């Protein structure tokens, strides 16, 4: 980001804080809004932002106070690898002229397939989108393992996934990007399996993106599962609505506070509220309450 864009963003953040009646923004690069925690709430365009074009998405994030966004693939914002160099600069400038941070890109690339040509296709696709992330001013791409195929030894698939992560991770590091591995997939979202994968990951640009699955609560429990992979946490976490279901979000926030986590907590909402901006504001209020606990 240029010095001009950085100053512009700082001005926008301070103006937003003043408009919300917040007098203690200080010199923080992003608005902590007087929270004790340094965690920040943002949005994944999974459902609530899927039909918003880019100007609308940025405007609605500004209105709600969710000042970070992970752009999901094949959504209405249209940020894909077919963008020209000029269009990529335009996307980057839109974010630079806003208090909203483009955290990264949410892809569906995965590397567990038995067909090695499909694995290679996913690796090369990841690299193309990592270049896009760099060009638009984002800092990384979300990928995932998505299962352990039947009929293949688990250890073989785990090693294949880790090897793929190492290849795309090396490429990401050269671009100054991160590979954020969503804890995902019928079997791979079980934390012992995710740990087994990361035990073979050698690139420090490859990070775990916690995903708030029911499997997190399997024995030996949330805290133990959290601790088993916290060494690899990056700067993104996916949550669902904080007031829906029975996932122990307050305990999770306490655990992240306990390790002084300073990354993005990204809302991957699944409900269909009549007013999504109002719903985003509500989630921010709940989040602030939980992170002040």
Locate predicted features.
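Conserved beta-strand positions in the central sheet of alpha/beta enzyme cores
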Residues: 70, 104-106, 142, 238, ...
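Acidic (Asp/Glu)-rich catalytic clusters
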Residues: 36, 58-63, 83-103, 127-137, ...
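Active-site acidic/histidine proton-transfer and metal-coordination neighborhood
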Residues: 15-29, 92-101, 111-208, 215, ...
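Extracytoplasmic "Venus flytrap"
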Residues: 47-51, 76-77
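Flexible loop residues that form catalytic
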Residues: 74, 110, 146, 242, ...
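Histidine-acidic metal/acid-base catalytic patches
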Residues: 2-42, 49-65, 188-293
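Glycine-rich, proline-tolerant flexible connector loops at the mouths of alpha/beta enzymes
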Residues: 72-92, 146-152
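N-terminal small/glycine-rich loop or linker at the start of catalytic domains
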Residues: 33-44, 102-112, 148
């Amino acid at each position: 980001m240029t010095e001009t864009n950085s100053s512009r963003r700082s001005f926008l953040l301070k103006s937003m804080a003043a408009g919300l009646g917040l007098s203690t923004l200080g010199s923080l690069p992003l608005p902590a809004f007087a929270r004790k925690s340094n965690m920040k709430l943002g949005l994944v365009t999974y459902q609530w932002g899927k039909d918003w074009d880019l100007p609308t998405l940025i405007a609605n994030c500004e209105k709600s106070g969710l000042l970070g966004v992970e752009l999901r693939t094949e959504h209405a914002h249209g940020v894909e690898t077919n963008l020209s160099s000029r269009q990529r600069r335009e996307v980057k400038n839109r974010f630079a002229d806003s208090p909203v941070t483009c955290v990264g890109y949410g892809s569906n690339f995965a590397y567990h397939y038995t067909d090695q040509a499909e694995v290679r296709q996913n690796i090369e696709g990841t690299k193309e989108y990592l270049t896009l992330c760099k060009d638009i001013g984002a800092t990384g791409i979300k990928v995932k393992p998505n299962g352990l195929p039947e009929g293949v030894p688990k250890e073989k698939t785990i090693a294949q996934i880790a090897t793929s992560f190492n290849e795309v991770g090396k490429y990401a590091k050269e671009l100054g990007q991160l590979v954020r591995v969503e804890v995902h997939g019928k079997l791979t979202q079980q934390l012992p399996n995710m740990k087994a994968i990361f035990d073979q990951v050698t690139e420090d640009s490859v990070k775990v993106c916690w995903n708030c699955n029911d499997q997190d609560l399997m024995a030996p429990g949330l805290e133990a599962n959290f601790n088993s992979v916290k060494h690899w946490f990056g700067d993104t976490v996916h949550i669902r609505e904080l007031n829906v279901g029975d996932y122990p979000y307050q305990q999770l926030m306490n655990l992240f506070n306990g390790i002084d986590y300073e990354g993005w907590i990204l809302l991957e909402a699944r409900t269909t509220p009549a007013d999504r901006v109002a719903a985003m504001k509500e989630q921010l209020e709940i989040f602030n309450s939980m992170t002040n606990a």
